[in-house]
Regions:
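Short, charged recognition helix plus adjacent turn
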Residues: 2, 73-90
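Short alpha-helical DNA-recognition segment
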Residues: 28-46
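Residues that mark the N-terminal boundary/hinge immediately upstream of a DNA-recognition element
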Residues: 19, 30, 55-58
Length: 90
């Protein structure tokens, strides 16, 4: 059965840490290299990849280096209203 409930913050945190680690590895960057390029401390990167904990500023700096900063542009954008019926589409 499909669930339309939003993900929990904990689940989102878990998914983000996994995706960011995978992206770092795909770009063949070590944690140390990412730390230097992003200006985020090595300790912060290690904590993020293990627990998902990171400041928003650091997350965005890492996203810039990992070429996914643009993915954050759609966050909290107002969505268009969905039609209530097929007649509303016509």
């Amino acid at each position: 059965m499909l669930s339309f409930l939003p993900k929990t913050p904990s689940l989102m945190q878990e998914e983000l840490k996994v995706k960011f680690r995978a992206k770092r590895k795909a770009l063949k960057l070590t944690q140390e290299e990412l730390s230097i390029k992003s200006g985020v401390s090595l300790g912060s990167l290690k904590r993020f990849e293990s627990s998902g904990q990171i400041s928003l500023e650091s997350l965005l700096k890492v996203a810039l280096v990992l070429e996914c900063l643009g993915d954050f542009e759609g966050v909290c954008q107002q969505r268009e209203e969905m039609p209530e019926s097929i007649e509303d589409l016509i």
